[in-house]
Amino acid sequence: MASLRDIKNKINSTKKTSHITKAMEMVSTSKLLKAQSNTQKFNPYMQKMQEVMGTIFGKSSSIKHPMLEKREAKKTLYVVITSDSGLCGGFNANVIRNFVNTVNERHANSEYGIVAIGNYGAEFFRKNGYNVVDSYRDIPDEPSFTQVKKITNKVVGYFIDKEYDE
């Protein structure tokens, strides 16, 4: 039977572990809130860019580029971004739930593909038999331009090569 001292040590150890876990959760929540804030700040810029690009390309018929082609959407590629770990509240669950709902509403069969960014999503999709075209794991909180460019070039390549239409 364990002595009183052993039991007290076990209780203290459990409390310390609990404090560490709570601190990690608070840090993750803070990072998530910062990312959400940055996303909201980016939206007006993105909308203005779309407006400017639409004006430029709408007035010029001489500009030809595969990304500007209008074509029927037969096959869709989704870029799903989750975290690498589970310490971010309901973020991963919400992203996956929204993705699954979208796929169920829009697609009757496997006319879509997934580029999974983050361990959590990549593992979920692999375990559940989804069509994962590509996955990127262990992306840092603030990825470098080179890392983002690599992913972007691959995704744009799928569209240009007409593997996916949207």
Q: What is each model feature region?
A:
Residues A2-E166:
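Conserved loop-to-helix interface motifs that mediate assembly, gating, or partner/ligand docking
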